[in-house]
């Protein structure tokens, strides 16, 4: 959520900026009307509260002197209903204003390129050289079919479309990838491993920005009166660990990593990537989350992105680093780097990691703060998140980049200790 003072003091300028950089239309007239009404009701409420307080004080003084207070009590009773109604009206209009604020996306940093969509993203760097094959290559679906490793038919029987059953060596490779990533981030990058719930409440999703705007993207479950949601990323669970917390300065930065199942409805995918495992309803991801002081978030963003890059480099997978434009960034992000891995069957790079600095946007929604050691006062933290990386897509990239003419897969050297020394599967 943006700083409310922007809505109150710089509304026209904010609306123009949001339209230009985010393509988001803010109804200025409606918001001005709401704010004007809020001020009117608030002034009226405060006047009545002040009157109540003065009358209550007078009643107390009169009673202490043994005087009759019935007239004063009657005066209080005369406006108490008005005060109660005014307080309710004030709360209602504050809720309306908050609903508007919760739907407004974060503002990009000044160095984020202006653009409408992914075509305006800017490539920052490349690593590795795509392999040249001397045989007809297969995509991951064909490679999986050769050995019965990827079973979409059984998954469809169990759950429907966009699910896959992994069998045998490929299931083992998938597990090895996740374990290897976790070990790297914990042992070499200094992240704390955290095992988090994959079912969360609505407050958690409000905190990180999935609700109320993106509810259609979420799977949910209802038990009695309690509605819960399956996480689309463990960023949700990890980041909300600091919700309503005040963190001492010497504990920052907090760096956490989790390997979890993730669930997405893919409501807006428009039929894209229906073949294979590129876009699934259920998938696994190793997620990185950092919580830091505001002055440290830019450096932390570069560090986190570099940690994700290291995963691809240790696997020997060619990739490129992309700076997202204003129109392609996520709702809560103020700056995002995507990492795209090379897929030989498609002859192109595909997203495998997205690393975002959210500034104080999520922290304000969560009331996540740190205690400034100089002033002694609580201030909003900055939050960052990044895939370190998507496990299923990493498996696809390994299958395709390490395939052999006979349909077997060479196991990357770094994964062999996790697979009892196997150098090849299939």
Curated annotation (Swiss-Prot):
ATP binds at residues 264-266, 351-354. Keywords: Aminoacyl-tRNA synthetase, ATP-binding, Cytoplasm, Ligase, Nucleotide-binding, Protein biosynthesis. One of its GO terms (biological process) is selenocysteine biosynthetic process. The keyword Aminoacyl-tRNA synthetase applies. Gene3D superfamilies: Bira Bifunctional Protein, Domain 2 (3.30.930.10), Serine-tRNA synthetase, tRNA binding domain (1.10.287.40). Pathway: Aminoacyl-tRNA biosynthesis; selenocysteinyl-tRNA(Sec) biosynthesis; L-seryl-tRNA(Sec) from L-serine and tRNA(Sec): step 1/1. Its EC number is 6.1.1.11. It is found in: Cytoplasm. CDD domains: SerRS_core (cd00770). GO terms for cellular component: cytoplasm. GO terms for molecular function: ATP binding; serine-tRNA ligase activity. SUPFAM superfamilies: Class II aaRS and biotin synthetases, tRNA-binding arm. Its main location: cytoplasm. It is an enzyme of class 6 (ligase). L-serine binds at residues 233-235, 287, 387. It catalyses: tRNA(Ser) + L-serine + ATP = L-seryl-tRNA(Ser) + AMP + diphosphate + H(+); tRNA(Sec) + L-serine + ATP = L-seryl-tRNA(Sec) + AMP + diphosphate + H(+). HAMAP family: Ser_tRNA_synth_type1. Consists of two distinct domains, a catalytic core and a N-terminal extension that is involved in tRNA binding. Catalyzes the attachment of serine to tRNA(Ser). Is also able to aminoacylate tRNA(Sec) with serine, to form the misacylated tRNA L-seryl-tRNA(Sec), which will be further converted into selenocysteinyl-tRNA(Sec). Homodimer. The tRNA molecule binds across the dimer. Belongs to the class-II aminoacyl-tRNA synthetase family. Type-1 seryl-tRNA synthetase subfamily. This is Serine--tRNA ligase. It comes from Xylella fastidiosa (strain Temecula1 / ATCC 700964). The lineage of its organism: Bacteria, Pseudomonadati, Pseudomonadota, Gammaproteobacteria, Lysobacterales. The gene is serS.
């Amino acid at each position: 959520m943006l700083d409310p003072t922007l809505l109150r003091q710089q509304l026209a300028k904010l609306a123009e900026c949001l339209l230009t950089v985010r393509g988001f239309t803010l109804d200025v007239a409606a918001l001005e009307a709401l704010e004007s009404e809020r001020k009117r009701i608030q002034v009226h409420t405060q006047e009545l509260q002040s009157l109540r307080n003065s009358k209550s004080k007078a009643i107390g003084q009169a009673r202490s002197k043994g005087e009759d207070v019935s007239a004063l009590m009657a005066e209080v009773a005369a406006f108490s209903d008005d005060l109660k109604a005014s307080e309710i009206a004030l709360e209602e209009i504050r809720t309306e204003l908050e609903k508007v604020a919760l739907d407004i996306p974060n503002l990009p940093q000044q160095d984020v390129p202006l653009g409408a969509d992914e075509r305006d993203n800017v490539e920052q760097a490349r690593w590795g050289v795509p392999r040249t094959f001397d045989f007809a290559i297969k995509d991951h679906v064909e490679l999986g079919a050769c050995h019965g490793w990827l079973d979409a038919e059984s998954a469809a029987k169990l759950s429907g479309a966009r699910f896959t059953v992994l069998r045998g060596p490929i299931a083992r490779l998938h597990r090895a990838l996740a374990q290897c990533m976790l070990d790297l981030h914990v042992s070499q990058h200094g992240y704390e491993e955290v095992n988090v719930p994959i079912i969360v409440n609505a407050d958690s999703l409000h905190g990180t920005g999935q609700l109320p705007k993106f509810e259609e993207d979420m799977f949910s479950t209802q038990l009695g009166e309690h509605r819960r949601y399956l996480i689309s990323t463990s960023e949700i669970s990890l980041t909300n660990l600091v919700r309503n917390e005040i963190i001492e300065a010497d504990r920052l930065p907090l760096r956490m990593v989790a390997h979890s199942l993730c669930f997405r409805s893919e409501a807006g995918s428009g039929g894209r990537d229906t073949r294979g495992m590129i876009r699934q309803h259920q998938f696994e991801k190793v997620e990185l989350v950092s919580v830091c002081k505001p002055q440290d978030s830019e450096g932390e963003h570069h560090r986190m992105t570099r940690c994700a890059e290291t995963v691809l480099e240790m696997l020997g997978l060619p990739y490129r680093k992309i700076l997202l434009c204003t129109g392609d960034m996520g709702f809560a992000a103020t700056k995002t780097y995507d990492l795209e891995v090379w897929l030989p069957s498609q002859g192109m790079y595909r997203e495998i990691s997205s690393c975002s600095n959210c500034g104080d946007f999520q922290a304000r929604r969560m009331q996540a703060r740190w205690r400034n050691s100089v002033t002694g006062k609580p201030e909003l933290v900055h939050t960052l998140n990044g895939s370190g990386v998507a496990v299923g897509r990493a498996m696809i990239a390994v299958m395709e980049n390490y395939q052999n003419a006979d349909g077997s897969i060479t196991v990357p050297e770094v994964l062999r200790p996790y697979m009892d020394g196997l150098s090849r599967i299939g």
